[in-house]
């Protein structure tokens, strides 16, 4: 199921001509050719068509024009009925300019909804109707129950519940205020400005209140009422009654954006207020009538689609058999027959023979030895060969999969053979109904991904490639007299009890399994200590076979250390039903673990459905909405590791997305951004469909956002392809002229920002928009903030639109920096990081927030003349900061620079962020330093002539040290430098304490396909930088050495910067 083939207005054409001839077929058989404006609406075209039709024969057979709609063929080769006649001709995405007039039939509302859903997800909904896979059809029906529950939940308390869905409180996970933030308050009190609109002309009045930081919004409103009524000279009783009457009728809104304080959280728990406290700013809140907000909220209706009433096509028993048998009663080894392959395209002159490599895997772990077919000539890829595996069918775990690949062999006699995978595929050995696969099957394979070093891809997607022109492998599984099912929990428990009692009867000296038998009765203190030590090991730390045996033999005691579960699961022999059954019984009653630990159980190492369900239940119990938002990128990615479409993780995320619109917004875009990826387009498309059916009126907002992004993609495609050789002036003229077209103005104004749905993008400020100079022609766009109080937050919103760069790596890096910042803040370290907004919205398409009042180091150095630009004057940056921050604010600017520089030194070192030059390090006017453009991380640094260009662990140049030491020549001997070092040390150790979290977050992203995050070897770089094999003292010594290397090797960075500056000046 591929996404839309192009972003053009007609097939193969980016923009329609200003006037275009459209062929219109009328119900009476007449064809009328109309000359239409490209931006003409369908209602205009229809009116003109019926006026023209009167000049043709048989016009008397036509009914009134309102009885008809247009239909045509779109670029997806789909027949689409156009019910919405406000749509413009250029936005219909027609294959050819041809329209047919018909009388509509069927359910009009459902057709309109299906079209809207198809547009926003980038795939016609009817494609799902055509899929014959019963799992797909059952999922579509069953997931509607989650949708219905979520919609009912939103309407539970009528308007308030609906408001909570649309404007969920944007709060920190904990109400506790970190000490260093509390110290910024005046005896625990905060000054808040409350604004009130007092006339239809939007005249404003303000009240300044000094209140306790832990007041709830209702108390703030009460205090505002008291202040407003002070001039009325009310008695204390009258005042009390007045407060009681009006307190519940008002709510607080953040001035300048769509954030509301709707719940009784302490004021300082709201992120806006906490940010104001940290930055030393006065919060501005608007008092508005609750009813005015409630009256704006749409009442969502949820209608079950027609496919929900269809009968399931899944047959409970294969081949018409009326009986089933348990997997565990079969007494034979697994075997699979490889029949033949088709569409295997190889160069016969380069390849000697081909063969099929196969393996039975559980996650990334083989359950038995891999087995290969015989080698055959490329010209005749037929095997008809049974492959026997060293595993009994009853020992197959629930998540077992067959992994296979067609491989080529190259090499002459006596020379070393070269084996290369040509295509790969995976098959679940149990389907979604717990049934063991049987019979013949054809599997279309997938192309080999970049960076795959092995012949098999066990953590890749299961199932057939929808592209039928790829290599196809035909194979056959054993048939059985009855349908074979994986046993249910009662059978598993019974078997577990039997195996435990059998184990208890073994003599330890007479069995080969003695080192794995349960020994909880003889647990010594040093055994307990060893278990605790194993528990604290990081997720990438290898567990030896002896340690696995030790863990398993003390499995019952492990329940008292709940967080050891991931290590215990890795010690299970998943090819032994005895151990799997016992593990299931342990997991069934395992105490809950923290969400950050539970997330580890969702990566590719833990494929078992019961284990993953346990992890999701922990998330349901303990994961706050704030933390869920923080980890949403990873939780969407690990959906790829789920065996089946319907699972607890899908249901958990969907329910959260449908009860919290902010979560739903990013849930939508994280799924939508991967719809071009064929390995997940069906899974993600189905999930997007179910979300869009139940998200209510927010679908209209998503429609507007997608429409705007489509317009921008089209514009940048033209600039990169058709206008690439034009001058900047000609390109800008084209951009402005195009944006002034009515369809572009409609699409690009008055919608919610995809970067932050609390921010509205109003009118485009065309005079402030520009095309940036880099090769991919990013657009720097500027919108007005239409909020009535915009001057109290920001009056314009600047966003960079990029088409051609993969922003997923930037998005991940910024998320990790944001999490680092949270850890530091909670530990009392205020390092003032600036993880600006960044969102990938499609295949190498995305948005980046522009940070206000910021400049690149290169721009600042160039202001210092030729010496500054060529790095000969290291005082340029310090002088610029002094000029920007004169008098008393100078010390604050240096402090802010020092803190942020320390934070980014530690973050860029730990994450191995490369390509650090003076164009991607920026400084704000107030002194805050931050990094941008994270195209290289985990030590994948740029190379020149085969050598890494960057020779220092992180950027700490003389320019920075001069600023930190306030201009001192011997900067390393100053107290300011010592303070800077102390900040770095504390920051490094704080992140080291949370090493497991960061390793888990990167591990969960392995399925993303990012070029620099392909394997656990890439993530091992974080183990190295955090020195996890060392003691804390040794780790600190290691980091100290890196820091010394950074500032002593700063001259090499300066040389890189000189060449970068010269190159940029040459390009411009």
Curated annotation (Swiss-Prot):
The superkingdom of the source organism is: Eukaryota
Q: A single Pfam family, by name?
A: PI3K_p85B
Effect upon mutating residue 227 to A = Abolishes binding to HRAS and KRAS; does not affect kinase activity; displays defective development of the lymphatic vasculature, resulting in perinatal appearance of chylous ascites and is highly resistant to endogenous Ras oncogene-induced tumorigenesis
Q: Mutating residue 933 to A: effect?
A: Loss of kinase activity; displays early embryonic lethality at 10-11 dpc and severe defects in angiogenic sprouting and vascular remodeling
Domain comment in the entry: The PI3K-ABD domain and the PI3K-RBD domain interact with the PI3K/PI4K kinase domain. The C2 PI3K-type domain may facilitate the recruitment to the plasma membrane. The inhibitory interactions with PIK3R1 are mediated by the PI3K-ABD domain and the C2 PI3K-type domain with the iSH2 (inter-SH2) region of PIK3R1, and the C2 PI3K-type domain, the PI3K helical domain, and the PI3K/PI4K kinase domain with the nSH2 (N-terminal SH2) region of PIK3R1.
Its EC number(s): 2.7.1.137, 2.7.1.153, 2.7.11.1
**What is its pathway?**
Phospholipid metabolism; phosphatidylinositol phosphate biosynthesis
Keywords annotated in UniProt: Angiogenesis, ATP-binding, Kinase, Nucleotide-binding, Phagocytosis, Proto-oncogene, Serine/threonine-protein kinase, Transferase
Domain spans labelled PI3K-RBD: 187-289
> In this protein, which residues make up the domain named PI3K-ABD?
16-105
Domain C2 PI3K-type as annotated: residue spans: 330-487
> How is this protein named in the record?
Phosphatidylinositol 4,5-bisphosphate 3-kinase catalytic subunit alpha isoform
- Entry similarity comment: Belongs to the PI3/PI4-kinase family.
Q: Which reaction is catalysed here? A: a 1,2-diacyl-sn-glycero-3-phospho-(1D-myo-inositol-4,5-bisphosphate) + ATP = a 1,2-diacyl-sn-glycero-3-phospho-(1D-myo-inositol-3,4,5-trisphosphate) + ADP + H(+); a 1,2-diacyl-sn-glycero-3-phospho-(1D-myo-inositol) + ATP = a 1,2-diacyl-sn-glycero-3-phospho-(1D-myo-inositol-3-phosphate) + ADP + H(+); L-seryl-[protein] + ATP = O-phospho-L-seryl-[protein] + ADP + H(+); 1,2-dioctanoyl-sn-glycero-3-phospho-(1D-myo-inositol-4,5-bisphosphate) + ATP = 1,2-dioctanoyl-sn-glycero-3-phospho-(1D-myo-inositol-3,4,5-trisphosphate) + ADP + H(+)
- Region (Catalytic loop) location: 912-920
Q: Per the database record, which ranges form the PI3K/PI4K catalytic domain?
A: 765-1051
Q: Which biological process annotations from GO are given for this protein?
A: actin cytoskeleton organization; adipose tissue development; angiogenesis; autosome genomic imprinting; cardiac muscle cell contraction; cellular response to glucose stimulus; cellular response to hydrostatic pressure; energy homeostasis
- Where do the segments described as G-loop lie? 771-777
What segment(s) does the record annotate as region Activation loop?
Answer: 931-957
Write down the species.
Answer: Mus musculus (Mouse)
Membrane-spanning parts: none
What did gene disruption experiments reveal? Lethal. Embryonic fibroblasts cells are resistant to oncogenic transformation induced by oncogenic receptor tyrosine kinases (RTKs), are unable to differentiate into adipocytes and deficient in cellular signaling in response to various growth factors. Defective responsiveness to insulin led to reduced somatic growth, hyperinsulinemia, glucose intolerance, hyperphagia and increased adiposity.
Recorded hits in InterPro entries, A to Z, give: ARM-type_fold (IPR016024), C2_domain_sf (IPR035892), Kinase-like_dom_sf (IPR011009), PI3/4_kinase_cat_dom (IPR000403), PI3/4_kinase_cat_sf (IPR036940), PI3/4_kinase_CS (IPR018936), PI3K-type_C2_dom (IPR002420), PI3K_ABD (IPR003113)
């Amino acid at each position: 199921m591929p996404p839309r083939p192009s972003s053009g207005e007609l097939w193969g054409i980016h923009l329609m001509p200003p006037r275009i001839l459209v062929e219109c077929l009328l119900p009476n058989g007449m064809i009328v050719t109309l000359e239409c404006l490209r931006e003409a609406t369908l209602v205009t075209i229809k009116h003109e068509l019926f006026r023209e039709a009167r000049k043709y024969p048989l016009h008397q057979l036509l009914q009134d024009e309102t009885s008809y709609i247009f239909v045509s063929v779109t670029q997806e080769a789909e027949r689409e009925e156009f019910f919405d006649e406000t749509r413009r001709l250029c936005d219909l995405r027609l294959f050819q300019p041809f329209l047919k007039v018909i009388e509509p039939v069927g359910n009009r509302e459902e057709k309109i909804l299906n079209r809207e859903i198809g547009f926003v997800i980038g795939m016609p909904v009817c494609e799902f109707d055509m899929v014959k896979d019963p799992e797909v059809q059952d999922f579509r029906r069953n997931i509607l129950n989650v949708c219905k529950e979520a919609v009912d939940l939103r309407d539970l308390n009528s308007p308030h519940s609906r408001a909570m869905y649309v404007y969920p409180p944007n709060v920190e996970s904990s109400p506790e205020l970190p000490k260093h933030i509390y110290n910024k308050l005046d005896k625990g009190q905060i000054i808040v400005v409350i604004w009130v609109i007092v006339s239809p002309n939007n005249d404003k009045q303000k009240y300044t209140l000094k209140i306790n930081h832990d007041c709830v919004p209702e108390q703030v409103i009460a205090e505002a009422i008291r202040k407003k009524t002070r001039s009325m000279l009310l008695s204390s009783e009258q005042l009390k009654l007045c407060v009681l009457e009006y307190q519940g009728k008002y709510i607080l809104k953040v001035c300048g954006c769509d954030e509301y304080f709707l719940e009784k959280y302490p004021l300082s728990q709201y992120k806006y207020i906490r940010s104001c406290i940290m930055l030393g700013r006065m919060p501005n809140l608007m008092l508005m009538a609750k009813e005015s907000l409630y009256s704006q909220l749409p009442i969502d209706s949820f209608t079950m689609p027609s496919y929900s009433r269809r009968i399931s096509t899944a047959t409970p028993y294969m081949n018409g058999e009326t009986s089933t048998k348990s997997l565990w009663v079969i007494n034979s080894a697994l075997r699979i027959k490889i029949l033949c392959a088709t569409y295997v395209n190889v160069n016969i002159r380069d390849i000697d023979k081909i063969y099929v490599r196969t393996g039975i895997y559980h996650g990334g772990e083989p359950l038995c030895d891999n087995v290969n077919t015989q080698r055959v000539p490329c010209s005749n890829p037929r095997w008809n060969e049974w492959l026997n595996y060293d595993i009994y069918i009853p020992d197959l775990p629930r998540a077992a999969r067959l992994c296979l690949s067609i491989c080529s062999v190259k090499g002459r006699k006596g020379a070393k053979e070269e084996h290369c995978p040509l295509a790969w595929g995976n098959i679940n050995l149990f389907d979604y109904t717990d049934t063991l696969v049987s019979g013949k099957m054809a599997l279309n394979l997938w192309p080999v991904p970049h960076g795959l070093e092995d012949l098999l891809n066990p953590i890749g997607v299961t199932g057939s490639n929808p592209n039928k022109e790829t290599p196809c492998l035909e194979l056959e599984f054993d048939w059985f007299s009855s349908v074979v099912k994986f046993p249910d929990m009662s059978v598993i428990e019974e078997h577990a009890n039997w195996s435990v009692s059998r184990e208890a009867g073994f003599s330890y000296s007479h069995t080969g399994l003695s080192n794995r038998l349960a020994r909880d009765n003889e647990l010594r203190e040093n055994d307990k200590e060893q278990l605790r030590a194993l528990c604290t090991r990081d997720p990438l730390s290898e567990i030896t076979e002896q340690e696995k045996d030790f863990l398993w033999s003390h499995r019952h005691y492990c329940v008292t250390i709940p967080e050891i579960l991931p290590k215990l699961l890795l010690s299970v022999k998943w090819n032994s039903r005895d151990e799997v059954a016992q593990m299931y019984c342990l997991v069934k009653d395992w105490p809950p673990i923290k969400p950050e630990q539970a997330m580890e159980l969702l990566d590719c190492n833990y494929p078992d459905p019961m284990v993953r369900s346990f992890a999701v239940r922990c998330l349901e119990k303990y994961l706050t909405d704030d933390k869920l938002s923080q980890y949403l990128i990873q939780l969407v990615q690990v959906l790829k590791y789920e065996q089946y479409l319907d699972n607890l993780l899908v249901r958990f995320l969907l329910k959260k997305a449908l009860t919290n619109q902010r979560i739903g917004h990013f849930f939508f875009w994280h799924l939508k951004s991967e719809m071009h990826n064929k390995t997940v387009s069906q899974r993600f498309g189905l999930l997007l469909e179910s979300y869009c059916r139940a998200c209510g009126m927010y679908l209209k907002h998503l429609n507007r956002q997608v429409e705007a992004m489509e317009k921008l993609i089209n514009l940048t495609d033209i600039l990169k392809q058709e206008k690439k050789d034009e001058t900047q002036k000609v390109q800008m003229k084209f951009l402005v002229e195009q944006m002034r077209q009515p369809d572009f103005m409609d699409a690009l104004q008055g919608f919610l920002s995809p970067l932050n749905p609390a921010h509205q993008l109003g009118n485009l400020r065309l005079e402030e928009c520009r095309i940036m100079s880099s090769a991919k022609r990013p657009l720097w766009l500027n919108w007005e903030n239409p909020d009535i109080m915009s001057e109290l937050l920001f009056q314009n919103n600047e966003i960079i639109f990029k088409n051609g760069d993969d922003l997923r790596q930037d998005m991940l890096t910024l998320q990790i920096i944001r999490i680092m910042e949270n850890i530091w803040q909670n530990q009392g370290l205020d390092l003032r990081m600036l993880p600006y907004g960044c969102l990938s919205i499609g295949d190498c398409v995305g948005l980046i927030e522009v940070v206000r009042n910021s400049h690149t180091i290169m721009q600042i150095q160039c202001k210092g003349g030729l010496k500054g630009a060529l790095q000969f004057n290291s005082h340029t940056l310090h002088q610029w900061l002094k000029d920007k921050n004169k008098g008393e604010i100078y010390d604050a600017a240096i402090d802010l620079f020092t803190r942020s520089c320390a934070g980014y030194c530690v973050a860029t070192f730990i994450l191995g962020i490369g390509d650090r030059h003076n164009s991607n390090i920026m400084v704000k006017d107030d002194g805050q330093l931050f990094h941008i453009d994270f195209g290289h991380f985990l030590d994948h640094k740029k190379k020149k002539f085969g050598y890494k260009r960057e020779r220092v662990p992180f950027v700490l140049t003389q320019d920075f040290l001069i600023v930190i030491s306030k201009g001192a020549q011997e900067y390393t001997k100053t107290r300011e430098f010592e303070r800077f070092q102390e900040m770095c040390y504390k920051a490094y150790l704080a992140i080291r304490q949370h090493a497991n979290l960061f390793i888990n977050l990167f591990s969960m992203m392995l399925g993303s396909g990012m070029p620099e995050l392909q394997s656990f070897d890439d993530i091992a770089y974080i183990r190295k930088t955090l020195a996890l094999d060392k003691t804390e003292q040794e780790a600190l010594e290691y980091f100290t050495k890196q820091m010394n290397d950074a500032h002593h090797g700063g001259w090499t960075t300066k040389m890189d910067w000189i060449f970068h500056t010269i190159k940029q000046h040459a390009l411009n």
